[in-house]
């Protein structure tokens, strides 16, 4: 089903988004870019699509998707000859796989740069794997004869997007089938959305410090060395006269830290740290039960949700202002049902 513009609204299947007078999508949802074929758009070279159920069925209540098909964006029709990446010397070009004449590298690069320059408002991007325009990693690259391909490339659109917006969470549809990668991607888009909201409301040192404080436990679960380094950067915020410049650097460092997948060991350390807050409130049986759940998670016999659920119960019973504000316990809407399987 094709997209259409109707009276200022962008209609895509069951999704409707309001456009403002400049054409930008306005929504209360989190803005996320996506390869159009992943929403079920019949825009692929063969007239098909690669509908991603996770995006369409699970993320859509929370996310305002902004679909792009770079190959149609440069004027190619549907259907069309397949494209592929070709390496000649040190240069990689985008060409038709049926060997017809035509180097699409420059036009695709120009289109990708124009698009990327207007996407700073996005909080994430989901791209189509293996695509010579959109693939994020391990895209096939052929030699000049169309042979000897190696899975070593990146699609031109995604390459430009990631170099222009290096802080932006980008993932492929295939990788999002991995529960931990899926969880990490959702976590990052929510963290960036909240950070962008602070800038929209007017940057202050206090607001940035409060934001960082809310994310401390979550950051600790990702990387202890990077957590400490980012903490030193935040402590030095008073040395920056230009808060916009500070925001740009903080955003890059924060999103780089969150891109590290959290480890079981780091999660265990965070859980044990939080356990210490209830040292005086819990009786012996309760302390033993909590310690047993944390150890069960450490040994992979309990999912992360088990100790977190018990900790949240104790947080409600014995309120602590610092813990109640920590995004570690609620990094995304509970209805997304992440953290359930590990």
Residue ranges, per PLM feature:
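N-terminal glycine-rich anion-binding loop in soluble enzyme alpha/beta folds
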Residues: 42-43, 47, 51-93
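Acidic, Ser/Pro/Thr-rich low-complexity regulatory regions
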Residues: 170-342
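Short amphipathic alpha-helices and their capping/turn segments at secondary-structure boundaries
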Residues: 26-27, 54-64, 111-123
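Short, hydrophobic/glycine-enriched beta-strand segments
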Residues: 31-38
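Positively charged N-terminal leader segments that act as targeting/secretion signals
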Residues: 1-11, 23-24
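Divalent-metal-activated hydrolytic enzyme cores
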Residues: 93-111, 121, 147-214
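Short catalytic/ligand-binding loop motif for oxyanion handling, primarily in non-cytosolic enzymes
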Residues: 42, 76-77, 133-137, 179-182
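N-terminal glycine-rich phosphate/adenylate-binding segment common to multiple enzyme folds
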Residues: 111-144
């Amino acid at each position: 089903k094709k997209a259409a513009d109707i009276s200022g609204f962008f209609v895509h299947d069951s999704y409707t988004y309001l456009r403002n007078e400049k054409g930008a999508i306005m929504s209360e949802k989190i803005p996320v870019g996506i390869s159009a074929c992943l929403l079920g758009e019949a825009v692929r070279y063969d007239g098909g699509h690669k509908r991603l159920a996770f995006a369409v069925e699970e993320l859509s209540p929370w996310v305002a998707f902004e679909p792009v098909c770079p190959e149609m964006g440069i004027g190619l029709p549907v259907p069309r000859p397949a494209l592929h990446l070709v390496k000649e010397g040190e240069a990689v070009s985008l060409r038709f796989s049926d060997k017809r004449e035509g180097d699409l590298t420059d036009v695709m690069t120009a289109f990708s740069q124009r698009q990327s320059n207007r996407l700073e408002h996005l909080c994430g991007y989901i791209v189509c794997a293996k695509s010579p325009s959109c693939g994020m990693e391990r895209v096939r690259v052929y030699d000049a004869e169309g042979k000897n391909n190696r899975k070593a490339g990146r699609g031109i659109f995604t390459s430009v997007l990631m170099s222009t917006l290096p802080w932006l969470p980008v993932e492929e549809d295939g990788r999002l089938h991995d529960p931990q990668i899926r969880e990490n991607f959702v976590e990052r888009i929510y963290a960036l959305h909240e950070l962008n909201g602070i800038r929209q409301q007017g940057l202050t040192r206090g607001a940035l410090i409060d934001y960082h404080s809310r994310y401390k436990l979550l950051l600790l679960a990702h990387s202890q060395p990077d957590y400490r380094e980012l903490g030193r950067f935040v402590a030095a915020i008073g040395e920056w006269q230009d808060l916009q410049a500070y925001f740009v650097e903080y955003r890059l460092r924060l999103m780089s830290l969150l891109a590290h997948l959290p480890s079981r060991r780091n999660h265990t350390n965070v859980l044990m740290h939080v356990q210490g807050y209830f040292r005086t409130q819990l009786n012996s049986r309760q302390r033993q039960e909590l310690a047993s759940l944390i150890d069960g998670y450490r040994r992979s016999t309990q999912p992360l949700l088990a100790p977190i659920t018990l900790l949240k119960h104790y947080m409600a019973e014995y309120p602590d202002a610092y813990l109640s504000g920590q995004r570690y316990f609620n990094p995304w809407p509970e209805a997304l049902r992440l953290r359930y399987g590990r």
